[in-house]
């Protein structure tokens, strides 16, 4: 279930004006076939990202659904950076998130990723209760990156506490998005196979609370030190999490994550947004070649 973030800025044909998301996905699928790594998943923006504006047009909706069905892709949308239903602007935000969820349903997108805030679980649950569930579309709560806040949602104790509240409140269609760069930035050492294995075994121990069917990953290395609180992604084995394992990749924490993802068939997205299409495709070619070797 491996794939990447598909930015229409970097993936669509120049001059594209109407069906740019579909065009981007078509080029992305062709690229995967070209490098010998057929993609099973993708992540897109259908709104924003920095403004509460829907940016998928009606023609694009029709063609995107056809594209997703044709290639049997699992696609998730990333919410805008304003999608914080536990904020003081929650009435407007909740309405906008509802629009995004309905569009996801319409075009065959399986989920919407929302950034978790560094706030108490009860506030998050109260915010989620304001959103009407949309059948077939999961809201994935993404692990945040922070250094000083009490609630980081990078430890299994805090993740379990949050999802127990979600389950006990009978909220439906809520999942977890684990960003490896974010949990590293929040102070979790996942560098070695053993370190990552310890964290992932703890995750497996709470599958009764948050099942793997509702877990996805943002598979990113990090350009900053463990516990920095800074969100800066890097290509796999090029950042501070796993670079020291670039010549012994099966001893790395990344290999342990790949094993978990494969064992439980979780979607995993590489989030790269480099300066040019050529830079992006060069980086992704190297990363997916490495992933292919880990999957053997």
From Swiss-Prot:
Could you say which enzyme class this protein belongs to?
Answer: hydrolase
Q: Which InterPro entries does the annotation name?
A: AP_endonuc_2 (IPR001719), AP_endonuc_F2_Zn_BS (IPR018246), Xyl_isomerase-like_sf (IPR036237), Xyl_isomerase-like_TIM-brl (IPR013022)
Statement: the UniProt record of this protein carries the keyword DNA damage: yes
**Protein residues bound to Zn(2+) 1:** 78, 271
Disulfide bridge map: 16-20
Gene Ontology biological process terms in this record: base-excision repair
By its UniProt entry, which Pfam families does this protein fall under?
AP_endonuc_2 (PF01261)
Query: Per the annotation, how and in what number is the cofactor bound?
Result: Binds 3 Zn(2+) ions.
Q: What is its EC number?
A: 3.1.21.-
Its chief place of residence is: host cell
Print the keywords alphabetically.
Disulfide bond, DNA damage, DNA repair, Early protein, Endonuclease, Exonuclease, Host cytoplasm, Host nucleus, Hydrolase, Metal-binding, Nuclease, Virion, Zinc
Give binding positions for Zn(2+) 2.
115, 142, 218
Q: Which cofactor does it need?
A: Zn(2+)
Q: What does the free-text pH dependence field read?
A: Optimum pH is 6.3.
Family per similarity comment: Belongs to the AP endonuclease 2 family.
| Protein's job | Endonuclease that plays a role in DNA repair. Cleaves phosphodiester bonds on the 5' side of apurinic or apyrimidinic sites (AP sites). In addition to endonuclease activity, the ASFV enzyme has a proofreading 3'-5' exonuclease activity that is considerably more efficient in the elimination of a mismatch than in that of a correctly paired base. Displays 3'-phosphatase and 3'-repair diesterase activities. The single nucleotide gaps generated by the AP endonuclease are filled by the viral AP endonuclease and DNA ligase.
Q: What is this protein called?
A: Probable AP endonuclease
Q: Which organism is it from?
A: African swine fever virus (isolate Tick/South Africa/Pretoriuskop Pr4/1996) (ASFV)
The lineage is:
Viruses, Varidnaviria, Bamfordvirae, Nucleocytoviricota, Pokkesviricetes
């Amino acid at each position: 279930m491996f794939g990447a973030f598909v930015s229409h800025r970097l993936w669509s044909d120049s001059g594209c004006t109407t069906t740019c998301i579909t065009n981007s996905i078509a080029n992305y699928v062709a690229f995967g076939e070209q490098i010998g790594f057929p993609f099973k998943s993708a992540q897109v923006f259908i709104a924003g990202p920095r403004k509460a504006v829907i940016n998928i047009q009606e023609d694009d909706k029709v063609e995107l659904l056809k594209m997703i069905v044709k290639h049997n892709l699992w696609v998730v949308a990333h919410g805008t950076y304003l999608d914080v239903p536990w904020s003081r602007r929650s009435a407007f935000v909740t309405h906008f998130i509802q629009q995004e969820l309905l569009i996801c349903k319409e075009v065959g997108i399986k989920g919407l990723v929302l950034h978790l805030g560094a706030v108490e679980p009860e506030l998050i649950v109260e915010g989620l209760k304001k959103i009407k569930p949309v059948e077939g579309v999961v809201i994935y709560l993404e692990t945040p990156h922070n250094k000083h806040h009490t609630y980081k949602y990078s430890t299994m104790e805090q993740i379990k506490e949050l999802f127990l509240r979600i389950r006990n409140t009978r909220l439906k269609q809520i999942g977890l998005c684990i960003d490896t760069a974010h949990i590293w930035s929040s102070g979790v050492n996942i560098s070695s196979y053993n370190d990552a294995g310890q964290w992932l075994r703890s995750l497996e121990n709470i599958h009764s609370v948050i099942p793997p069917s509702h877990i996805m990953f943002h598979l990113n290395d990090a350009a900053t030190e463990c516990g920095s609180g800074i969100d800066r992604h890097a290509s796999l084995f090029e950042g501070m999490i796993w670079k020291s394992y670039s010549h012994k990749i099966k001893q790395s924490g990344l290999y342990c994550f790949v094993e978990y993802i494969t064992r439980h068939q979780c979607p995993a997205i590489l989030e790269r947004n480099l300066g040019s299409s050529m830079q992006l495709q060069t980086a992704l070619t190297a990363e997916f070649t490495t992933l292919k070797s880990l999957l053997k």
